[in-house]
């Protein structure tokens, strides 16, 4: 007799289910699918492997990957290799936490709710905002949600977004806006920052929000004070997308009058991995508190006066208001938010500041070394941990040669902006050593 590790349902189960919905066969269930589009052949699946054989097979496939564990990486562009305290994996792997699901029953979820509350608190401290949610799927979806909130709040349909915002974030924004029949206008960038004159020309009373990234896609710092002055001429919302690590050394967007601050918490405790998952954050003002998307954890007291934590302001959410909900996020990135919380806690306020400072200092050092090697550094404004260089040839060719030297080169800007062909976005984090930076500069000098 054959043994089966997993039987989803028996033939009797299938008959009972079909009878319940009033059809007599699987074919009848899928009758609305045209015959011409149905797959009727046998799937070309190989014979089953024994578990040791299966492990060996996937290990062989995994060994074909080129990893940052064996290569020195200078690639960022939205996903960053940072130090992760060893305690992070220990805490998030505990059975009490090992889920991304929403803790609907606060009386049995105090530990998880407190951890989420601490995440919200730390995000507020970094951004200078009044309130933050429990997490979003990633930075781009958080940015899109900020735009949707702004349009709903102002009753306007025009969104101005800087071209210095990450192109993938802009793509997610456009996808969301299309379904809502909203108008997205992109503002030109000049010298790697938002062009102020272009913003002034595009701004009018029909604008719901202005979105910038700080530090932006090119690593440059935006003139937030100038931009805020333009945005708040009318009733538009000022939305800033920020790398939270950069806020360890930068003045928080809240101090510049931002109405909404979003971003990705990946730099804290979340490793570089293909396809994610990440952890978006969303912070705003008390004025917009009841319109914020996602779960909110609040602190309260029980009937005996003891401190406790609950999901609060749930009237915004789909399990309460259904189609009238202002938030349609269900299970979120709670596990990754916990990883970010543990990382920030382990580093401490001074540790976060020191980590951010090292990013600034090491990227500045590499900029100088590349210039000495004859490489053209594009733009002379302040940057965080990324900057643009001219390679004078296809970046993919340079990166191919760098890979042979054991290095992963920077992002090919020409792949998303044809007018930037030959330009590379270089990333330097605290993990890069002086020897690695010197070697990269020397190799680039020889290649370019």
From Swiss-Prot:
CDD domains according to UniProt: GDC-P
Q: Which Gene3D superfamilies does this entry report, sorted A to Z?
A: Aspartate Aminotransferase, domain 1 (3.90.1150.10), Type I PLP-dependent aspartate aminotransferase-like (Major domain) (3.40.640.10)
Q: Membrane-crossing residues?
A: none
- What are the entry keywords? Oxidoreductase
Q: How does it assemble?
A: The glycine cleavage system is composed of four proteins: P, T, L and H. In this organism, the P 'protein' is a heterodimer of two subunits.
**HAMAP family, per this entry?**
GcvPA (MF_00712)
Role of this protein: The glycine cleavage system catalyzes the degradation of glycine. The P protein binds the alpha-amino group of glycine through its pyridoxal phosphate cofactor; CO(2) is released and the remaining methylamine moiety is then transferred to the lipoamide cofactor of the H protein.
Instruction: Give the protein's recorded name.
Output: Probable glycine dehydrogenase (decarboxylating) subunit 1
Organism, as annotated: Shouchella clausii (strain KSM-K16)
In the UniProt record, what gene is named as encoding this protein? Answer: gcvPA
């Amino acid at each position: 007799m054959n043994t089966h590790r997993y039987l989803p349902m028996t033939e009797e189960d299938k008959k009972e289910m079909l009878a319940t919905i009033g059809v007599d066969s699987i074919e009848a269930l899928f009758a609305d699918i045209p015959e011409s589009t149905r797959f009727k052949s046998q799937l070309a699946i190989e014979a089953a492997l024994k578990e040791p054989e299966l492990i060996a097979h996937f290990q062989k496939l995994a060994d074909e990957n080129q990893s940052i564990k064996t290569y020195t990486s200078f690639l960022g562009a939205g996903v960053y290799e940072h130090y992760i305290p060893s305690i992070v994996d220990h805490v998030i792997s505990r059975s009490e936490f090992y889920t991304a699901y929403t803790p609907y029953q606060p009386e049995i979820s105090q530990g998880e709710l407190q951890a989420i509350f601490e995440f919200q608190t730390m995000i507020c401290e970094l951004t200078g905002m009044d309130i933050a949610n429990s997490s979003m799927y990633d930075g781009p979806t958080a940015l899109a949600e900020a735009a949707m909130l702004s349009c709903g709040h102002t009753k306007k349909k025009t969104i101005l977004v800087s071209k210095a915002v990450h192109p993938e974030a802009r793509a997610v924004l456009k996808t969301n806006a299309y379904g809502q029949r909203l108008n997205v206008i992109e503002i030109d960038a000049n010298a790697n920052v938002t062009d102020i004159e272009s913003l002034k020309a595009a701004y009018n009373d029909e604008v719901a929000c202005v979105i910038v990234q700080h530090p932006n896609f090119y690593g440059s710092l935006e003139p937030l004070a100038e931009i805020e002055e333009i945005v708040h001429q009318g009733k538009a919302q000022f939305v800033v997308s920020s790398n939270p690590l950069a806020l360890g050394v930068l003045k928080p967007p809240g101090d510049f009058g931002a109405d909404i601050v979003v971003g990705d918490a990946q730099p804290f405790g979340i490793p570089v991995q293909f396809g994610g998952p990440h952890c978006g954050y969303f912070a705003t003002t008390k004025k917009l508190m009841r319109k914020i998307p996602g779960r909110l954890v609040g602190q309260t007291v029980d009937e005996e006066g003891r401190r406790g934590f609950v999901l609060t302001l749930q009237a915004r959410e789909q399990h309460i208001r259904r189609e009238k909900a202002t938030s349609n996020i269900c299970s979120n990135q709670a596990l990754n938010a916990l990883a970010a919380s543990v990382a920030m806690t382990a580093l401490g306020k001074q540790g976060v500041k020191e980590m951010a400072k090292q990013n600034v200092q090491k990227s500045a050092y590499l900029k100088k070394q590349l210039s000495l090697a004859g490489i053209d550094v594009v733009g002379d404004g302040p940057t965080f941990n990324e900057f643009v260089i001219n390679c004078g040839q296809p970046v993919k060719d340079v990166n191919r040669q760098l890979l042979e030297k054991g290095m992963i080169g920077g992002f090919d800007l020409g792949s998303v902006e044809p007018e930037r062909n030959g330009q590379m976005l270089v990333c330097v984090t605290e993990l890069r050593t002086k020897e690695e930076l010197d070697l990269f500069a020397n190799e680039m000098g020889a290649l370019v």
